[in-house]
Each structure stands twice: as structure tokens, then as C-alpha cells.
Amino acid sequence: MLRFLKPFPLRFGKRFYSKVPPVTNHERILPKQPSFPTAPAQNEIATLTIRNGPIFHGTSFGANRNVSGEAVFTTSPVGYVESLTDPSYKQQILIFTQPLIGNYGVPDCKKRDENGLLRHFESPHIQCAGVVVNDYATKYSHWTAVESLGEWCAREGVAAITGVDTRAIVTFLREQGSSLAKISIGEEYDANDDEAFINPEEVNLVSQVSTREPFFVSGGDGMLNIAVIDCGVKENILRSLVSRGASVTVFPFDYPIQNVASNYDGIFLTNGPGDPTHLTKTVNNLRELMNTYNGPIMGICMGHQLLALSTGAKTIKLKYGNRGHNIPALDIASGNCHITSQNHGYAVDASTLPAEWKATWTNLNDQSNEGIAHVSRPISSVQFHPEARGGPMDTFYLFDNYIKEAIKYQKSRTA
């Protein structure tokens, strides 16, 4: 069971707070997931068709259904469970560059840690629409595994194809850019059927992965209170906060956080899928928040882009995005390079930042922006994922810095 905050009001140090909205939920409330047949469509003929591109034939090992979405690739050698449950991959067709996938199976989706957070998954369900691998491991072995990757995909309604040349697919996407694609199960398919190529980024994908109602996760003594704007939050972001002693209140992406921000020691903006320009209400809320709130604000991934948009800066769509656990990012202030975990198709155009903002991180592969900060206030964000899961832990310290700022702000309010 989740450990949660006591009924309101809350007490922090010498100051008494009682305006936090009464929340009775202790788990995220997500849109209802459709049910699918549980038997995998194994050894069925399957086809990956890239719009205005090549066609690849293989065999299915997932759900017996046709799907479409934006074809993207990840260079992560491990962590397919974490990648597939990352909400930032919502409705995308994910191609793995690692040739062998599925060899350690899938752990129990119901296992939770001492804070009630999912132990092995980044969200309750697979988020991508389809999975593409070169060689699917039909036999798996790991002490935490309870089912195969194919069984999991079938149960979640996710189409999966193996036996295709993923190197050729990635080469095409790298040269031509991310493209719409579809996976068809069975012998009948129409490569020119444009109606089958559905562009998920034409809609607000964040609304499909954000909690419908606020919920609590409590950590440590609960004396530090952080408000999280959920654009598709990964479980390990919440874990990274509560493991540092924070109690976390998670709000829907479009919640008017500016109305309750004074009750919190920090505001946190999470990752999420799709085009950030769809979230005009969230951007307007953040703009108003920064006009009235003096505490620390931190953003990750989508949160980074939304923070930039709220300042008046612009975002751009990358040619094929950055997705993997081995991407170098430069800390401009120190000159140090860190290996980071990333998953995004958009980036902030640093040249459009207002004068009171500065770029703080740069991607060393494509020179895109990886971080911004206000020059005088404790507001900052990064494009990469310091919480990892999977990936390197080089930038874990960014959570420590944020918590230190939240404690500092709390003390200034209770003095």
C-alpha cells in the first residue's frame, strides 16, 4: 500500500498550511485501458511499412492487431521493460538497435516498493503502439521474470515484429528523419493506404497519460512538500523525490497549480509524450506561476520544453530525436561531460530564450539544447533524464540540488 500524507491541514516548521486541496487518492487515476486477447500472434507473418519508405517483412510475437504511429529508435542496450513503460513513448513504434531483445523476460507488473511505487515499471502499462526487434528471444531467464516479452505485449495489445533488419530501418530514419509507420499482422496489407498512417502527434498525448486526479506519495518524515505536474511522469522520478525525504502531491497536467503553489516547497515538471505546443493551458499556468511563486521549479524532458515555452522561447522538432542511455551532454558551467538517458523528439531553441534566461547544457552529438536556467531565481530544467531507469546515474545530483533549494525556500518561509 502507498504511504500517504495525513489528512489536511499540514504543518511545516513554524508555519501552518491548510490550503492544500483535500486529496483522497493515493494512486494515479489513468484513462481506462482496452482489453485484448492474451494469446500472442506468434509466427504470424508481420509487416513493418514506413510511409514513403521501405517495407520490412518478419514474424509477429505480440498482439494480433494492426497498429500505426511514429517510428522512432532507441540505442539503449538494456532496459526494454523501462523503455516500453515510459509514457514519453506513447503511441510510437519503437525500434530497438540492440539485436537481441526479450532474453530476461518481464517482471511482475504488480510489485511495488516501500513507497507504493512500481518496482520494475515506469508506468502501469506498455505505452508504445508497436515494438520492432531484430531477434526476439523466445527463451528468457531472470529471477524476477514472470512472463515473456511476447506474452506481455499480447496482453497489453501491443503489436511486435521480429526478424527484420533493424540496422537498415535505423539508417533510413537517421537519414530521412522520424517517419510514420504501421505494423500489419497477416498476409494482407496495403502499403499505400494513407488512412492507416495515423500521426499521434496531431493530438494531445499528454492527456492520455497524465493522472486524472491529484494523488499523494509520501517519503521520509514528510516535512518537505513538493507539487508535481504530471505530463506522463515516470515512477523513478517520483522515487527520486521521495527517497530524498519529500512528500509528493501529483497533479494533472492542466491543473491550475498557481492557485495552490504557495503551499509547496517546490514545483516539479515531468516528462511526457508528443508536441509540447499542444499544452497551451499548462504553459499559461506556468507563466502565471512564475509571476507569483518564488520557490524552486525544476523540469525534466517535456517539463523542460514547457518551462521554455512559458518564458516565450520556442521549441523545434528534431530530425530523428534522441533516445537512448548513452548520450553525452555538456554542463556548460563546469565543462564536464555526462552520459545521460534521453527520450525526446523535440528540443528548446536556445536562441529564442529571453535575456534573463541562459542555456546550461548542450547535447554533444547534435549540439541541441539540453538545459536552461533563470539567471537569478532557482528555476531550471534539463532535457535529459537524471533519474535514469534505465541508464547512467551521472546526473542524480540534480535531484539533490533541487531538494536543497526546496529546503532553503521552506526555511525562508518558516523563519
Swiss-Prot record:
CDD domains: GATase1_CPSase
Pathway terms, separated by semicolons: Amino-acid biosynthesis; L-arginine biosynthesis; carbamoyl phosphate from bicarbonate: step 1/1
Residue positions binding L-glutamine: 88, 272, 274, 302, 305, 343, 345-346
Gene3D superfamilies: 3.40.50.880, Carbamoyl-phosphate synthase small subunit, N-terminal domain
One Pfam family it belongs to: GATase
GO MF terms, alphabetically ordered: ATP binding; carbamoyl-phosphate synthase (glutamine-hydrolyzing) activity; glutaminase activity
Catalytic activity: hydrogencarbonate + L-glutamine + 2 ATP + H2O = carbamoyl phosphate + L-glutamate + 2 ADP + phosphate + 2 H(+)
Top-level enzyme category: ligase
GO cellular component, one term: mitochondrion
GO BP, sorted A to Z: 'de novo' pyrimidine nucleobase biosynthetic process; arginine biosynthetic process via ornithine; glutamine metabolic process; L-arginine biosynthetic process; urea cycle
Additional detail: In S.pombe, this enzyme is synthesized by two pathway-specific (arginine and pyrimidine) genes under separate control. One is linked to the arginine pathway and is designated CPSase A (arg5-arg4), it is localized to mitochondria and repressed by arginine. A second one, CPSase P, is part of a multifunctional protein (ura1) encoding 3 enzymatic activities of the pyrimidine pathway (GATase, CPSase, and ATCase); it is localized to the cytoplasm and feedback inhibited and repressed by pyrimidines.
Functional note: Small subunit of the arginine-specific carbamoyl phosphate synthase (CPSase). CPSase catalyzes the formation of carbamoyl phosphate from the ammonia moiety of glutamine, carbonate, and phosphate donated by ATP, the first step of the arginine biosynthetic pathway. The small subunit (glutamine amidotransferase) binds and cleaves glutamine to supply the large subunit with the substrate ammonia.
Alphabetical list of PANTHER family matching this protein: CARBAMOYL-PHOSPHATE SYNTHASE SMALL CHAIN, MULTIFUNCTIONAL TRYPTOPHAN BIOSYNTHESIS PROTEIN-RELATED
Subunit structure: Heterodimer composed of 2 chains; the small (or glutamine) chain promotes the hydrolysis of glutamine to ammonia, which is used by the large (or ammonia) chain to synthesize carbamoyl phosphate.
Family: Belongs to the CarA family.
Name of the protein in question: Carbamoyl phosphate synthase arginine-specific small chain
Source organism of the structure: Schizosaccharomyces pombe (strain 972 / ATCC 24843)
Origin organism lineage: Eukaryota, Fungi, Dikarya, Ascomycota, Taphrinomycotina
